[in-house]
Amino acid sequence: MESVALSRIGLAGLAVMGQNLALNIADKGFPISVYNRTTSKVDETLDRASNEGKLPVAGQYSPRDFVLSIQRPRSVIILVKAGAPVDQTISALSEYMEPGDCIIDGGNEWYQNTERRIVEAEKKGLLYLGMGVSGGEEGARNGPSLMPGGSFTAYNNVKDILEKVAAQVEDGPCVTYIGEGGSGNFVKMVHNGIEYGDMQLISEAYDVLKNVGGLSNDELAEIFTEWNRGELESFLVEITSDIFRVKDDYGDGELVDKILDKTGMKGTGKWTVQQAAELSVAAPTIAASLDCRYLSGLKDERENAAKVLEEAGLKEDIGSASRGVDKKRLIDDVRQALYASKICSYAQGMNLLRAKSLEKGWDLNLGEMARIWKGGCIIRAVFLDRIKKAYQRNPNLASLVVDPDFAKEMVQRQAAWRRVVGLAISAGISTPGMCASLAYFDTYRRARLPANLVQAQRDLFGAHTYERTDRPGAYHTEWTKLARKSQ
């Protein structure tokens, strides 16, 4: 009889994400125990559970009572701040857990921390999952994208719960077993890196349309609404159209124009760029988006630079660049440039996942990654279905850029893409994401690059040797001596 009263699963960490995920689980018919070190959050969650449909949520006020209220083998989700708080929570809960029980960390954790915790958990006979959760507060409550990696046994213990709780799309729930070790956290990290790129590219489209095209916020709202009905249909494009419509409560006009132009960040974009560098994977669009966040933080320096350079004679070119612009054509060009740039950004993210999968032996299914990102998550977009199909057609696809369907689209959008970047440059408007994407495309598609000169330079000053195009082997040349002889 005792087991009847036990919860199916537990969740510790009741900030908004934790509360919403717990209520989502309960809403799907799974009795859940909840715990938070600050006990007022437990009461808050219980109040919400009552108000949102008398959901089966049991509040617990100590680690011991919490753990013992869950049926064996116990599965406990932790949603606390990454780093030391996770270790502290694990320590408090594992004291009362038994071999075969499972801990699931749902935070944005560095993947190597997850791999360390897997080893530590195994010593106690515990199972461990590092699970990326994307979708923000709304996604956690109504259906997120879930990326669990680690113990396959632990995944199977909660698979039925995760599949009901996750966002649902036409080809299934937005969750799959990612792979061993810290793969779930790594995939979520790359998701966030792609998200950085997406947001940067959208902000550049906005900048060009507003400052070169002279479009109002009302016009921008309509344009993004229209774009969200086509190839650019996505969560980020949808919310952007909403943002342009919100009026300022404290004054005239729209709120977006009153927001300080300094972008915050929590570190996952930086981790993505660092991992790309470690694995020798080119990810210039994601890197450019990170650099832009750093530069946005230099507000005082940027204002001073604008003043100093104006005094030095730099003239504002936006006005001259915008004169005579065909608005209709510009809008369509920007749409095409945004789409082509996005393909490059996603290609970079997917290539990073593949490189890490090869290094770690995770055997990541890139088509499945695209599928579970189709719903619930921040980067959900209609064209993820086409990315899924590209990897289903060819699991060993070197890059999305060379998938036959995407290749045609890139070629079709080239002229518009170049016009937008050229116009922005002539207007003095920075579009680092679009420029990085275009440079990536142009570099990747060239059969021969000027890297031959770089190799010659390296050989001259460092005797690093070089290869030839016409015969095998490594060669070294006494460049300076031969150059002087020929003078």
UniProtKB/Swiss-Prot annotation:
InterPro entries attached to this UniProt entry: 6-PGluconate_DH-like_C_sf (IPR008927), 6PGD_dom2 (IPR013328), 6PGDH_C (IPR006114), 6PGDH_Gnd/GntZ (IPR006113), 6PGDH_NADP-bd (IPR006115), NAD(P)-bd_dom_sf (IPR036291), Pgluconate_DH (IPR006183)
Keywords of this entry: Acetylation, Chloroplast, Cytoplasm, Gluconate utilization, NADP, Oxidoreductase, Pentose shunt, Plastid
Catalytic reaction list: 6-phospho-D-gluconate + NADP(+) = D-ribulose 5-phosphate + CO2 + NADPH
Molecular function GO terms recorded: NADP binding; phosphogluconate 2-dehydrogenase activity; phosphogluconate dehydrogenase (decarboxylating) activity
Subcellular location: Plastid, Chloroplast; Cytoplasm, Cytosol
GO biological process, one term: D-gluconate metabolic process
GO cellular component, one term: secretory vesicle
EC number: 1.1.1.44
Pfam families reported in the protein's UniProt record: 6PGD, NAD_binding_2
N-acetylmethionine modification, residue list: M1
Record: active site: K188 (proton acceptor), E195 (proton donor)
Binding site residues for NADP(+): G13, L14, A15, V16, M17, G18, N36, R37, T38, V80, K81, A82, N108
Residues noted as binding substrate in the record, renumbered to the chain: N108, S134, G135, G136, H191, N192, Y196, K266, R293, R458, H464
Keyword Oxidoreductase among UniProt keywords: yes
Pathway noted in the entry: Carbohydrate degradation; pentose phosphate pathway; D-ribulose 5-phosphate from D-glucose 6-phosphate (oxidative stage): step 3/3
Described purpose of this protein according to its UniProt entry: Catalyzes the oxidative decarboxylation of 6-phosphogluconate to ribulose 5-phosphate and CO(2), with concomitant reduction of NADP to NADPH.
Subunit structure: Forms homodimer. Forms heterodimers with PGD1 or PGD2.
Similarity remark: Belongs to the 6-phosphogluconate dehydrogenase family.
NCBIfam families: gnd, PRK09287.1
Name of the protein described by the UniProt record: 6-phosphogluconate dehydrogenase, decarboxylating 3, chloroplastic
